[in-house]
Amino acid sequence: MMYSPICLTQDEFHPFIEALLPHVRAIAYTWFNLQARKRKYFKKHEKRMSKDEERAVKDELLSEKPEIKQKWASRLLAKLRKDIRQEFREDFVLTVTGKKHPCCVLSNPDQKGKIRRIDCLRQADKVWRLDLVMVILFKGIPLESTDGERLMKSPHCTNPALCVQPHHITVSVKELDLFLAYYVQEQDSGQPGSPSHNDPAKNPPVYLEDSFVKSGVFNVSELVRVSRTPITQGTGVNFPIGELPSQPYYHDMNSGINLQRSLSSPPSSKRPKTISIDENMEPSPTGDFYPSPNSPAAGSRTWHERDQDMSSPTMKKPEKPLFSPTSPQDSSPRLSTFPQHHHPGIPGVAQSVISTRTPPSPSPLPFPAQAILPPAPSSYFSHPTIRYPPHLNPQDTLKNYVPSYDPSSPQTSQPNSSGQVVGKVPGHFTPVLAPSPHHSAVRPVTLTMTDTKPITTSTEAYTASGTSQANRYVGLSPRDPSFLHQQQLRICDWTMNQNGRHLYPSASEDTLGITWQSPGTWASLVPFQVSNRTPILPTNVPNYGLNIIGEPFLQAESSN
């Protein structure tokens, strides 16, 4: 089966949806929308639709474009996924697709502990029980929203109150149903091929001719056709589901189709929000399907891994990533997982590294980076999209450089008591730049990192052998807050007051402390020299605040 890109946009795309969409019956779209239209009409006009009006609505819904039907079905599947407990979502996919023997699939209960109700994206005050929705979607049985008492659970079901496994749900048939099934006269009974035409004995006797009035607008042939037809039938070849790399649960699905999902489609900036009555009354207690409108969560990781808790800095590596962006332009708008061998020498990040949503913007520096980069290769991993801060690599000598801060941030810097990176890598990182080869006599400031004290700088580093007392480094922090996606990393001014007293009691008499706000963007260091306490600044660094490292109160700022 193929799917239109209108149906499965980047917001609607999900392996959970792609696996289940071929099993949704075509009657589901027409049936749910028809019932919602009838309900809205009754609320507005305080009377029921006439047969002609209802038939016109039915014909309109049946003739709707397949792409529209699939888009609706994909959004409804996404909503159902939220209502299924996380640990049962995989079993649900495998059992519906026929790859596993049916087992119980429990849903998240409502506030009273009962099965939840949803409005099936029609924004009408008509809600459906989840088990009813499952039967209509995957079995094509035209049940009413009030037919919940007609449903019975299989004897093998261990939790009948919350189970939404379609194979465990049956429809009870009473005597009246059997009687009507035998005697009801269809409008097309006179046409060849109809049940009544083929078997005259099924025609009701004279005393029953006026006993039955057909209130629906579907005939038998229509119901059978739409209940047996998948909702994906009749669409063009534009969107794949056949290949889901590294997804062992779907590797044999549609094995005859060899397709590859395009990664070059532009990410949507905003997902249309669905306002539903049941969401207003009872929001789902679980996470969202698209982890947010622009969720860092959806696209490149497997559907069951996105539900894992990512609060720990140590993340579990999947068996194989679904895909990796081949270029900065092809990067997915969601988080991509890279194997560990892509970044050797970074023990602080166990098993995986998260790439950010978009490649970093070009540097606004008016001079080329080669002017301040050393020709020798650095020890950290170089990637056009991912930047690894040098503090993640204890062997990287660039950790000795002092990063700068973002002057546009209004927050006050606070010390980091642990002296280590906190949690995840939240945004883009630019490597700390080494001193220019033209200033070979300049030496970087040495940082002493401890677990109990703020990061301190020893004054002995300024008077080391071979280093002039006047040689200093300056940290560049751009005025433009969008420079390299600046995060909340800041460096406070020196922890001395004007009387020369240390602000932190833990600081010794020969140390000067700096503090961190939070991990974020790393700024560059440019060597400069001080003559008679006057900094000799580079000529090509306008629009940057210069914080001199080495003397407490000697600061300079270049003018525009």
Swiss-Prot record:
Which InterPro entries does the UniProt record give? Answer: CTF/NFI, CTF/NFI_DNA-bd-dom, CTF/NFI_DNA-bd_CS, CTF/NFI_DNA-bd_N, MAD_homology1_Dwarfin-type
Assembly and interaction partners: Binds DNA as a homodimer.
Family the UniProt entry places it in: Belongs to the CTF/NF-I family.
Residues forming the motif 9aaTAD are 396-404
Intracellular or extracellular location(s): Nucleus
In the UniProt record, which is one GO cellular component term? Answer: cerebellar mossy fiber
Free-text comment on this protein's domains from its UniProt entry: The 9aaTAD motif is a transactivation domain present in a large number of yeast and animal transcription factors.
| Gene that encodes the chain | NFIB
Residue numbers spanned by region Disordered: 257-369, 384-445
As annotated, the DNA-binding region falls at: 1-195
Residue spans of biased composition, Low complexity class: 407-420
- What does this protein do, in the record's words? Recognizes and binds the palindromic sequence 5'-TTGGCNNNNNGCCAA-3' present in viral and cellular promoters and in the origin of replication of adenovirus type 2. These proteins are individually capable of activating transcription and replication.
**Keyword terms, alphabetized:** Activator, DNA replication, DNA-binding, Nucleus, Transcription, Transcription regulation
Organism annotation: Gallus gallus
Composition bias (Polar residues) maps to 324-339
Q: Which domain of life is it from?
A: Eukaryota
Molecular-function GO terms, alphabetical: DNA binding; DNA-binding transcription factor activity, RNA polymerase II-specific; RNA polymerase II cis-regulatory region sequence-specific DNA binding
Q: Which GO terms describe its biological process?
A: anterior commissure morphogenesis; chondrocyte differentiation; club cell differentiation; commissural neuron axon guidance; DNA replication; glial cell differentiation; lung ciliated cell differentiation; negative regulation of epithelial cell proliferation involved in lung morphogenesis
Q: Per its UniProt record, what PROSITE patterns does this chain match?
A: CTF_NFI_1 (PS00349), CTF_NFI_2 (PS51080)
- This protein is called Nuclear factor 1 B-type
Q: Main subcellular localization, coarse class?
A: nucleus
